[in-house]
Amino acid sequence: MLDTLVPGAPVLVAGGGVTGRAVLAALTRFGMAATLCDDDPAALQQYADNGVATVSAATATQQMFERGRKYVLVVTSPGFAPTTPVLVAASAARVPIWGDVELAWRLDAAGYYGPPRRWLVVTGTNGKTTTTSMLHAMLAADNRRSLLCGNIGRPVLDVLTEFAEPSDFLAVELSSFQLHWAPSLRPEAGVVLNIAEDHLDWHSTMADYTMAKARVLTGRVAVVGLDDSRAAALLSTTVAPVRVGFRFGEPAVGELGVRDGYLVDRAFAEDLALMPVTSIPVSGPVGVLDALAAAALARSVGVGATAIADAVALFRLGRHRAEVVAVADGIRYVDDSKATNPHAALVSVLAYPRVVWVAGGLLKGASVDAEVARMAPQLVGAVLIGRDRAMVAEALSRHAPNVPVVQVVAGEDAGMHAVAVVSGTDVISISDVGGTIGTRVMVAAVAAARDLAQPGDTVLLAPAGASFDQFSGYADRGDTFATAVRAAIR
């Protein structure tokens, strides 16, 4: 399983971020000769100063074409797309390319960290973090040793390395990027929650995106969300010996679902009531579905109903996930900045009867038309920010023509001081509030949203896009929204 990894084996590590550091630490621990490549000279210098062999990405790309194999393996950070030049060159030179998850899986399965763990893996376009966190809580409530890792914040390699006591289970959240570079992953159980357009700027096609997600269904137990047509279709294609679905409605045999106000398991028991729906702290159908998905994975390894009910009842959402930041003058302000794609934004909007929608950012190649059409009856206004705001505006004009729309326009230059607030084609105000471009944009957006909102409405930040055009991440975007709201209502 690890034929290419022997002491002294030359391995190229692509990317010097958090993942790259974890990969370097693991390779060094087991005696491989690791070289780091990156296109950031400052990052390379920091590693070189600490004794790490480094090379520029351009040089590493050229090395792939030189006679004789310079590297026996490339381990890449998940953000590096298959079209990245060094990876294209490695593929052409027939050098294997793994991601950090692939490396972690192989090392763990080969016993490098002691007895192999049982991997329970969660993926999907939306709901991954909540579901994985619930799963981890269920395992802990049943006195199972479990570690929470993956796309949720801690690289799997770091978790395996830093915890001396072996864990029985890994509750792992994985993105499509991570799964693309993990071809041999075979988890104990895996779930695909849902599949909607996302990251099409990284994956070449929707089929490739779906194929990456389906890699979690290659182990003993495959679980899919039956209310999502794309996810449900994967159940008939998986090779897993145990196939399970979950749905918001009444479950058939082999499914988990809802009956008479209870979550019910008919997959791992004949007919077992797990817990009342009313005890789920995450409101709406999305909370029920996340709990069902987590319960399916937990039940697949024998976690009892009492532990599942206790874990969910005590569960609390993380920051920037439907987080109420203020209520003033009868208007509720909600930060759902984690809604970074159209499907997530749709689910968020549908949870409220009357919404002033604050949206926009980087759509990553995804269309918003279908989602805007479905949410249109809930919308009483929209305030659009970010680079791809015009695409959202066009969808609103087609599917919600009577909804007032305000666009907050900012230049690409981060040093720009003026932010124009535009309604239709007319600039209606200019704001110069100081601070970062993100701060100025959000202050203007909140002011516009307050003008549109009436008592009983919800001003909802559910952007439908990534944040990196104007913010350092979704957390920064959410924090900036909350700060702007609190300043506005003082």
UniProtKB/Swiss-Prot annotation:
Catalytic activity entry: UDP-N-acetyl-alpha-D-muramoyl-L-alanine + D-glutamate + ATP = UDP-N-acetyl-alpha-D-muramoyl-L-alanyl-D-glutamate + ADP + phosphate + H(+)
Annotated GO biological process: cell division; cell wall organization; peptidoglycan biosynthetic process; regulation of cell shape
Main location: cytoplasm
Subcellular location: Cytoplasm
Keyword annotations: ATP-binding, Cell cycle, Cell division, Cell shape, Cell wall biogenesis/degradation, Cytoplasm, Ligase, Nucleotide-binding, Peptidoglycan synthesis
This protein's pathway: Cell wall biogenesis; peptidoglycan biosynthesis
Binding positions (ATP): 124-130
GO cellular component, one term: cytoplasm
Record-linked InterPro entries: Mur-like_cat_sf, Mur_ligase_C_dom_sf, Mur_ligase_cen, MurD
Any GO molecular function: UDP-N-acetylmuramoylalanine-D-glutamate ligase activity
NCBIfam families xrefs: murD (TIGR01087)
PANTHER family listed in its UniProt record: UDP-N-ACETYLMURAMOYLALANINE--D-GLUTAMATE LIGASE
Similarity annotation: Belongs to the MurCDEF family.
Protein task: Cell wall formation. Catalyzes the addition of glutamate to the nucleotide precursor UDP-N-acetylmuramoyl-L-alanine (UMA).
Protein name per its UniProtKB record: UDP-N-acetylmuramoylalanine--D-glutamate ligase
Organism: Mycobacterium leprae (strain TN)
Source lineage: Bacteria, Bacillati, Actinomycetota, Actinomycetes, Mycobacteriales
